[in-house]
């Protein structure tokens, strides 16, 4: 039996380095990843270290609102 609907939701992770720097002067764009999270296990905002092709390094990517 399922306890509830929509336990796993799709979230968008955005590079915090690109947003903070106002997008690099060299290239335009902001790195975004799409992933899923379980609301019961992680009720707060998700933050992961992912590779940003615009910053050319691994940076923190935080969950954004849809």
From Swiss-Prot:
One GO cellular component, as annotated: chloroplast
Name of the molecule in the record: Large ribosomal subunit protein bL33c
Gene Ontology MF terms: structural constituent of ribosome
Keyword Ribosomal protein: yes
Family (UniProt): Belongs to the bacterial ribosomal protein bL33 family.
Subcellular location: Plastid, Chloroplast
UniProt-listed GO biological process terms: translation
Annotated Pfam families: Ribosomal_L33
Organism placement in taxonomy: Eukaryota, Viridiplantae, Streptophyta, Embryophyta, Tracheophyta
UniProt keywords, alphabetically: Chloroplast, Plastid, Ribonucleoprotein, Ribosomal protein
InterPro entries recorded: Ribosomal_bL33, Ribosomal_bL33_CS, Ribosomal_bL33_sf, Ribosomal_zn-bd
Main location: plastid
UniProt keyword rRNA-binding present: no
